[in-house]
A protein has these predicted regions:
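Short, positively charged patches
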Residues: 1-139
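Glycine-biased, small-residue-rich flexible motifs in mid-sequence functional cores and linkers
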Residues: 1-3, 83-246
Length: 246
């Protein structure tokens, strides 16, 4: 039996048909990803609702092979792999039913400080919106200098939020809709690198994952779940920012 919680957590995300909610329920019920696999055959007796299809899904050697490759990337690039059992995992996010059971992080920050907010908005930011970001973040730097500011590194409001935070020496984290083997959009790479000293880049996605449309919706639940409040600066009536706020 493998006793690496990180490896087992990654493998669990790759087991077909388990999903975010199912994976978290298994870990919450049994205690760890290691124990989910170690007690696979006894799960129906230990956890109500676990049936033979779940047992079959957990018998997935390919998931462990892929997880091993991911851990090689993590260690080679000095990334941090956070599982639900880690004290440094975002505590607010851990309380969400669909919290990811593993996160990948590059940077330096405390996700569990007293105040964490996210600022999001349209990719077609107006001059007013850009100035609001700068002014609001500056005011925060005076009133709550230890606040962590979260956004998504996207065009428009997101990137202006990150740059405003950097300008005021505040910690800022971008939650990404792809793996840490790339930066999207690439034009924001310099800002992303600048964030690593006091903030960083966070994702639930494995390397090789493209920034596909549905990944942004999944990403938004992390942005909202790890924060105390969501501030929508500008948004279309059906924009992704309002999905985050909801």
């Amino acid at each position: 039996m493998n006793n690496d919680e990180r490896l087992c957590s990654i493998a669990l995300t790759l087991c077909p048909g388990i999903g975010h909610i199912g994976a978290k329920r298994l870990i919450d019920g049994i205690g760890s990803a290691v124990d989910v696999f170690g007690h696979r055959n006894e799960l129906p007796e230990l956890l109500p609702g676990v049936n033979s299809s779940v047992i079959a899904a957990l018998d997935c050697p390919a998931a462990f092979l892929r997880a091993e490759r991911e851990m090689e990337f993590v260690e080679k690039n000095r990334l941090t792999c956070l599982t639900l059992r880690d004290e440094t995992y975002p505590s607010r996010l851990r309380e969400c039913e669909d919290a990811p059971i593993v996160l990948f992080f590059k940077g330096n920050t405390d996700f569990n400080r007293l105040h964490v907010i996210n600022m999001v908005g349209t990719r077609r930011a107006t001059e007013y919106g850009k100035q609001f970001c700068a002014d609001f973040v500056h005011d925060l730097s005076v009133l709550l200098p230890d606040v962590l500011i979260v956004s998504g590194l996207a065009y428009g409001i997101d990137i202006h939020v990150h740059r405003a935070a950097l300008a005021d020496n505040m910690s800022t984290v971008a939650v990404l809709a792809h793996g840490l083997d790339r930066i999207y959009p690439f034009v924001h790479r310099k800002t992303a690198v600048d964030m690593l000293a006091n903030g960083g880049l966070l994702t639930e996605f494995l390397t090789g994952t493209n920034p596909d449309r549905h990944n942004f919706v999944s990403r938004n639940r992390i942005v909202a779940g790890m924060c105390d409040a969501t501030i929508v600066v500008e948004s279309a009536a059906k924009g992704g920012s309002l999905i985050t706020a909801d």
